[in-house]
C-alpha cells in the first residue's frame, strides 16, 4: 500500500495556516529564542512533566497509508488524573491580542498530538493546553480545552481527508517519476574517460546509504576538469532515486555558476528524454528573488509593506497547484512569473514548492548554515541524497557560517 509520511506540523500548517508573511515573527533569532523558552518552561514544569514526547500513528484512508509523527512539547497528568497535552508557543503579539482563538493551527497541533496519545494510551478523554509566552513581558497565558478521544480521532481523520487529494497527487507523481527514471539513459553517446567509474561510485554510495539507513554513507570524489562531474553525479543519483534509494536529491553549490551547471545537466536529460518526469527547483537568495524592497534595497517582508507577503498563505495552495500542474523546471524566472500571477512571495514560494520537488538546487547554506538551513527538511530525518559541488570551498564557508557576528 502506498504510504505518505507527514509531520504533525506539516499536516496542520499546510491545511490550516492562514494570514501573511511577517519577518517580525520569524527568523533564526526568534527560533533560537523560542527553543530556549521552551526548554525553560519544560524544566520549570517539574518531574511529572514529560518534555519532547515523540508520538507516531498510522492511518489508512481510501487505499493510502499515512504515517503521522512529531514531538509534543509536553505531556503530564493533572491533579484530577487527566492527561494533558501541552503545546508551547512563544509570541511577540501584544498581551491583549493573545486570545484563545488567536491561531487555529495551535489548537490543531495539540489536538492531533492528543488523538495519537489517546490512541496509544487507550484514553477516553484528555485535555489540550496552549501555553503562550509573551517574549517582551515574560507573561505566560494558558488556555485549556477538554476533548473526548472520539472527537480527536474524528478531527485527525478529517484533516487526512482534506489532505487526500494532495497525497494522491504526490503518490501518482512519484510512481510516474520512478518509472521514467528507470527508463532514463545516459544523455551522451559515450562516457568520457573516468566518467563511468565516477558515476558508478556515486550510484554505489547512494545504494549503500539506503542500506545503512541511519547516517548513510559518504563519498569524496576528486576529478580533473572536463570529465563531466555534474552529470557524473546527477545521473547515477537520479537512477538510484528511481529505484527507491532516496526520496529527494539536494544539489548544493558555492556559486551561481555551478547552480547553472546543474540546471544545464537536468535540461540535457530532459532534452534527451522528453518523457522524463522530474521536478526540480532552484532556490535563489531572498535578496535576488524579492519583488518588493524597502528604501534601502532590502526585502520588505511585512504585510503592510509588501502585497506578496500580505495574505500569502491564503493564496499559496493555488500557486502550488499551478506550478505542480506544469512541466517546466522551476527556476527563478518560473517562480517569479507564478508569484506575480498569484501575488505571492517568490522566495517563500520556492521554499514551499521544494517539498514537492525531486531535485533541489541551492547554496551550501540551505544545509550547513544554522541561521538559514531548511528546517522543513533537516530538523527531522529524511531519506535524502546530497550532492555537494566543489566541497573544497566548504571549510571557508563553514567558518563564516559558524563564527559569531557582532553588530
Describe every region a protein language model picked out.
Residues 1-78, 82, 104, 108:
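Metal-dependent nuclease catalytic cores that hydrolyze phosphodiester bonds in DNA/RNA
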Residues 57-153, 233:
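Mg2+/Mn2+-dependent nuclease catalytic core
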Residues 173-222:
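Conserved pre-motif I regulatory segment
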Residues 228-235, 256, 260:
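Phosphate-binding Walker
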Residues 230-245, 265-269:
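Walker A/P-loop NTP-binding motif
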